[in-house]
Design a protein with these regions (language model features):
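Acidic, proline/glycine-enriched N-terminal capping motif
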Residues: 1-139
Length: 139
């Protein structure tokens, strides 16, 4: 069984940085983060039939206008915004494939795809990533 795409979308919005999610020692969400979460909810809210036992793969390309932006800063705010409106927990994400692109200011975006992986695919992916260590192979 091949992986099943749950959602694939381009969001014409600036990727949000994990560094700007909270203030007051991480206790309060920033206004900008609340707005980002609301936008993601409007775009993605729905019943996707994701089960608690599903293994998920997130694939994304983020278009940043700042050449100083770190790719990994996009993961946490995006996943935390997706999970309540799509019905999954980010602990179900077993693989993230990501790239960044530099774009002009005002042309920022997030392209994302969320796939359901089979156990067999998950084991094969581990072996492909580090063949030297024989990860995911049956003994």
């Amino acid at each position: 069984m091949a992986s099943q795409t749950i959602v694939e979308v381009r969001i014409n919005q600036k990727p949000f940085s994990a560094n700007k999610m909270h203030y007051r020692d991480g206790k309060i969400d920033t206004k900008e983060y609340k707005e980002f979460r609301s936008n993601i909810r409007e775009l993605l809210e729905g019943d996707y039939g994701i089960k608690p036992t599903d293994k998920l793969r997130l694939t994304l390309i983020v278009g940043y206008s700042s050449k100083l932006a770190d790719l990994d800063n996009a993961f946490k705010p995006l996943l935390d915004s997706m999970q309540p409106c799509m019905g999954f927990d980010d602990r179900q994400v077993f693989e993230i494939k990501a790239m960044k692109n530099h774009v002009k200011k005002g042309e920022e975006y997030i392209m994302l795809r969320l796939d359901r992986m089979t156990d067999n695919q998950w084991g094969k992916r581990q072996a492909q990533m580090f063949p030297k260590f024989h990860i995911g192979e049956k003994e």
